[in-house]
């Protein structure tokens, strides 16, 4: 077997191509280029101290041996995490398919119709289960979904009602996350408290953490009378058999779709869900997929109501959510499509019947179970023997939950067998009864659900395979072309890095399994912590935040708690440059901080005079500065160390946004520069795929004095959790472990250098026609550059939207649009792209500029040309009545390098965004209904 260094496969340039690019950039070596781009004061000056790189095969073998130290006991712990069977047709054709996992968040609707359509079905699934009309296109997990729900309730009362009343027993990890969020928002969360006039919402669990259903009719009636919203945390499998919560008064329903065919993965990733009533639509957090039409009246999908979101409303946004859990939401939807409503109900009925037989057997021998009504989970009273019984269960290869000394909880699921139930019953001196009556509370579903045709269309694996292929063919992902999104780092997600995620030893471990049952995970996480600390210079890393935005929130919480520990409770003001990503101010607001914006100069740098003035003006209240480095303008600011020192001199801490860490690895370290805390987007710099809008992982690194203030977890007896599981989306950490293990210090540094070279090469080529808006001291950019396309608007009426849509005809996803400067494109090629693809992209943008000139010269009218009509579908270009002033060839094949056999055709023309928001349609109506 030929084993070349992995980095030679990861990095797209061949040695001879590198020299050609250096010639275009007008520099003699890549080291010289880096020395011109990167301030000398922040150079690391030594190699990273990491294990020597190994081959793909060696890394896979090493990780496999490590993860084999996890014990694959069968889990009956429950607590929001369940065994589930992932249909192989979904595992292979969706979860392990780069057409699905390498796509980006679907901001560009026309090239994202496949995953938008399936997310639309996800929203339909949630609406059907809950009975509520509007659902988000996934949230990060169940706990954060409830935290978002209480924020919705708080905002709905115009932030006047400050109390949240928990009227049932939540899972402990959910309660912990809610308490963390409530603390920063000034909300009072209490259990079984009186509902009063200043109660914003009550929270009900369906079922509760012990598995019991309770009669909430009176408390709901009281809440409605007092003007409080009703929030329900509901099990989506139980909902297939039970009346939809909206029918008995729910205003918001949240939960996790993990048990719909998504592995436990030691905590994630999983798709949380949230559905609301019509009155709460514009307060809902995260993404919503809406239906609209294209220019020909064809149905198309798009992200709707984006004015609620952080990238537009910043600190006024409904949430800081950017990346959610699109890939896992799509997996759950595919699971529902695969089984159909009847199949889902059969699974639920089998699980419930097995639980009833188990409980019946216990009751027959006088064993007491708490709660008259249940679905798949029961609390059993054992009077001081809880741990003894749990040990006996474990000896038989089964894990159960110890609630306290006197009670154990056993949760059955899709994978539970009669043999399992019988073995567990024997622990109590019981067996199973042959027959048992249902023990669900209230009446079951009295109406059909999931009657929409797409939940009934799949009858065989052939159908399912083609269904998923049909959807993925509509999309443009990294498996087809470069995605040059600035600040998003759409690099290669290598197959060897992804393979371990599907291993049973990675996928099938419960997050609350004991440390001795997850030794492999603990070792992998320990190693990854050490490697990331070396790469960044920090003292400790927390892997709990399950997105970059969650990392920001967790990091700011650490800073806030640090100040409070020193008695400086007044330090709640956060300085943020005007160029910052929208999640920065949104996260600061979520962390209970006041945002003050710092000006930027014309060259893109932070205005040091304005920063100094505001740091001194707010010296007594200053908590932190949030700063991205290199800046969102694609430049290494020379004064970054001075900026950090200035904040420290005025009592603040420096929050380092790690969105652009791909431009630092191996060259400089945030902690050495002066950062106190930094989040690392593992789904950018460290090779975890974007999944079409999630999963993401945003661990935070901190300096020594902030270590005590990292997120804790109730499972470990600590507080201030920000996610449901102790290590967040733990299963995909193996991707980053593999990436670092195979790249080694040399490979990581070379990747960073190559990313810088590629960006400067693009800047050099495009500067023939376009202005590169920002450059560093020596005329260089960092790993990305901002191309000023406003001249095309001024001279020819061609907008940045027109350019983005026209790039689709050339076979490209558009770069980041209008951020941080309206009317511009921010381009990041990463280190993974070959020169030929980079040249093809540059040729496309240069060709578009030439097309714009034809408008100026009168060859094409301003309102009838290939740019304003882009993108062009196959159907449109074959239209018998073609009457454009440009040819079909110019429409669909504007560049001779386009291969007709490999041409990407968008399924729709330009989507009407205004129409989609004016008449919001975010789920399919039941069969027989009309819009």
Swiss-Prot record:
Cross-referenced SUPFAM superfamilies: PLP-dependent transferases
Residue numbers of N6-(pyridoxal phosphate)lysine PTMs: 684
Any one of the GO CC terms: cytosol
Catalytic activity: N(6)-[(R)-lipoyl]-L-lysyl-[glycine-cleavage complex H protein] + glycine + H(+) = N(6)-[(R)-S(8)-aminomethyldihydrolipoyl]-L-lysyl-[glycine-cleavage complex H protein] + CO2
Presence of the UniProt keyword Lyase in the record: no
Origin superkingdom: Bacteria
Keyword rRNA-binding appears in the UniProt entry: no
EC code(s) of this entry: 1.4.4.2
Molecular function as annotated in GO: glycine binding; glycine dehydrogenase (decarboxylating) activity; pyridoxal phosphate binding
InterPro entries assigned: GcvP, GDC-P_C, GDC-P_N, GDC_P, PyrdxlP-dep_Trfase, PyrdxlP-dep_Trfase_major, PyrdxlP-dep_Trfase_small
Cofactor(s) of this protein: pyridoxal 5'-phosphate
Assigned keywords, A-Z: Oxidoreductase, Pyridoxal phosphate
GO biological process: glycine decarboxylation via glycine cleavage system
Record's subunit section: The glycine cleavage system is composed of four proteins: P, T, L and H.
PANTHER family linked: GLYCINE DEHYDROGENASE (DECARBOXYLATING), MITOCHONDRIAL, GLYCINE DEHYDROGENASE, DECARBOXYLATING
Function: The glycine cleavage system catalyzes the degradation of glycine. The P protein binds the alpha-amino group of glycine through its pyridoxal phosphate cofactor; CO(2) is released and the remaining methylamine moiety is then transferred to the lipoamide cofactor of the H protein.
Family indicated by similarity: Belongs to the GcvP family.
Stated name of the protein: Glycine dehydrogenase (decarboxylating)
Organism: Bartonella henselae (strain ATCC 49882 / DSM 28221 / CCUG 30454 / Houston 1) (Rochalimaea henselae)
Gene behind the chain: gcvP
């Amino acid at each position: 077997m030929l084993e070349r260094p992995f980095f030679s496969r990861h990095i797209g340039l061949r040695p001879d191509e590198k020299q050609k690019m250096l010639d275009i950039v007008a520099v003699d070596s890549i080291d010289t280029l880096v020395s011109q781009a990167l301030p000398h004061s922040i150079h690391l000056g030594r190699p990273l101290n990491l294990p020597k790189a190994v081959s793909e095969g060696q890394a896979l073998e090493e990780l496999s041996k490590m993860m084999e130290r996890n014990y694959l006991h069968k889990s009956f712990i429950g607590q929001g995490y369940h065994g589930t069977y992932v249909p192989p047709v979904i595992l292979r054709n969706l979860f392990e398919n780069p057409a699905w996992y390498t796509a980006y968040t679907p901001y560009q609707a026309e090239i994202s119709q496949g995953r938008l359509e399936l997310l639309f079905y996800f929203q339909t699934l949630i609406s059907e289960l809950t009975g509520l009309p509007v659902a988000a296109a996934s949230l990060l997990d169940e706990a954060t979904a409830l935290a978002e729900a209480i924020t919705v309730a708080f905002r709905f009362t115009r932030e006047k009602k400050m109390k949240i009343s928990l009227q049932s027993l939540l899972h402990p990890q959910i309660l912990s996350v809610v308490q963390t969020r409530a603390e920063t928002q000034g909300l009072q969360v209490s259990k079984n408290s009186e509902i009063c006039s200043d109660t914003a919402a009550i929270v009900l669990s369906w079922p509760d953490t012990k598995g019991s259903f309770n009669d909430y009719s009176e408390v709901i009636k009281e809440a409605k009378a007092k003007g409080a919203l009703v929030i329900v945390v509901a099990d989506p499998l139980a909902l297939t058999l039970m009346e939809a919560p909206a029918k008995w008064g729910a205003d918001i329903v949240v939960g996790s779709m993990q048990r719909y065919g998504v592995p436990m993965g030691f905590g994630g990733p999983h798709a949380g869900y949230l559905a609301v009533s019509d009155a709460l639509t514009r307060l809902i957090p995260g993404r919503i997929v809406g239906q609209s039409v294209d220019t020909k009246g064809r149905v198309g999908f798009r992200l709707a109501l984006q004015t609620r979101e952080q990238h537009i409303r910043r600190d006024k946004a409904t949430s800081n959510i950017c990346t959610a859990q699109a890939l896992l939401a799509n997996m759950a939807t595919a699971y529902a499509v695969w089984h159909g409503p009847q199949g889902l109900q059969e699974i639920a009925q089998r699980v419930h019947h097995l639980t009833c037989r188990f409980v019946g057997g216990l009751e027959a021998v006088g064993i007491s179970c708490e709660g008259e009504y249940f679905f798949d989970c029961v609390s059993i009273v054992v009077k001081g023997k809880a741990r003894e019984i749990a040990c006996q269960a474990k000896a038989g290869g089964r894990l159960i939950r110890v609630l306290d000394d006197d009670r154990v909880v056993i949760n059955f699921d899709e994978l539970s067998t009669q043999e399992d139930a019988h073995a567990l019953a024997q622990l109590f001196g019981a067996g199973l009864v042959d027959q048992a009556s249902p023990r669900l509370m209230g009446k079951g579903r009295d109406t059909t659900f999931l009657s929409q045709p797409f939940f009934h269309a799949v009858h065989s694996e052939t159908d399912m395979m083609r269904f998923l292929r049909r959807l993925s063919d509509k999309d443009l992902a990294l498996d087809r072309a470069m995605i040059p999104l600035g600040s998003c780092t759409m690099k290669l997600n290598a197959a060897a890095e992804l393979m371990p995620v599907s291993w049973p030893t990675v996928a099938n471990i419960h997050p609350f399994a004991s440390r001795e049952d997850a030794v492999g995970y603990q070792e992998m996480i320990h190693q990854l912590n050490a490697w990331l600390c070396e790469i960044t210079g920090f003292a400790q890393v927390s892997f709990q935040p399950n997105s970059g935005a969650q990392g920001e929130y967790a990091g700011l919480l650490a800073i806030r708690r640090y100040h409070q520990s020193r008695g400086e409770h007044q330090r709640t003001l956060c300085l943020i440059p005007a160029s910052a990503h929208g999640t920065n101010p949104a996260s600061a607001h979520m962390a209970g901080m006041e945002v003050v914006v710092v000006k930027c100069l014309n060259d893109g740098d932070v205005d040091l005079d304005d920063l100094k003035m505001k740091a001194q003006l707010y010296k007594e209240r200053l908590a932190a500065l949030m700063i991205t480095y290199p800046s969102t303008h694609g430049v290494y600011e020379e004064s970054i160390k001075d900026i950090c020192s200035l904040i420290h001199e005025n009592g603040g801490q420096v929050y380092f946004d790690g969105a652009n860490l791909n431009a630092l690895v191996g060259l400089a370290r945030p902690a050495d520069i002066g950062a106190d805390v930094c989040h690392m987007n593992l789904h950018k710099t460290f090779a975890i795929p974007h999944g079409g809008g999630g999963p993401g992982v945003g661990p935070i690194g901190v300096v020594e004095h902030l270590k005590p203030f990292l997120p804790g977890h109730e499972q470990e007896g600590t507080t201030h959790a920000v996610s449901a599981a102790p290590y967040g989306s733990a299963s995909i950490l193996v991707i980053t472990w593999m990436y670092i293990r195979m790249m080694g210090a040399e490979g990581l540094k070379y990747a960073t250098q190559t990313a810088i070279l590629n960006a400067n090469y693009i800047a050099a080529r495009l500067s023939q026609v376009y202005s590169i808006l920002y450059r560093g001291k020596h005329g260089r950019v960092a790993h990305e550059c901002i191309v000023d396309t406003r001249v095309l608007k001024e001279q020819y009426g061609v907008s940045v939207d027109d350019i983005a849509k026209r790039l689709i005809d050339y076979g490209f996803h558009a770069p980041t649009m209008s951020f941080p400067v309206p009317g511009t494109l921010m381009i990041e090629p990463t280190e993974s792209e070959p020169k030929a693809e980079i040249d093809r992209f540059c040729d496309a943008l240069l060709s578009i500029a030439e097309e714009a000139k034809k408008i100026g010269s009168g060859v094409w009218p301003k309102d009838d040309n290939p740019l304003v009509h882009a993108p062009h579908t196959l159907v449109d270009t074959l239209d018998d009545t073609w009457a454009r002033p440009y040819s079909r060839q110019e429409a669909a094949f504007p560049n001779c390098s386009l291969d007709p056999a490999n041409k990407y055709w968008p399924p729709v023309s330009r989507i009407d965004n205004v129409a989609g928001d004016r008449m919001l349609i975010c789920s399919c109506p039941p069969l027989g209904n009309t819009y």
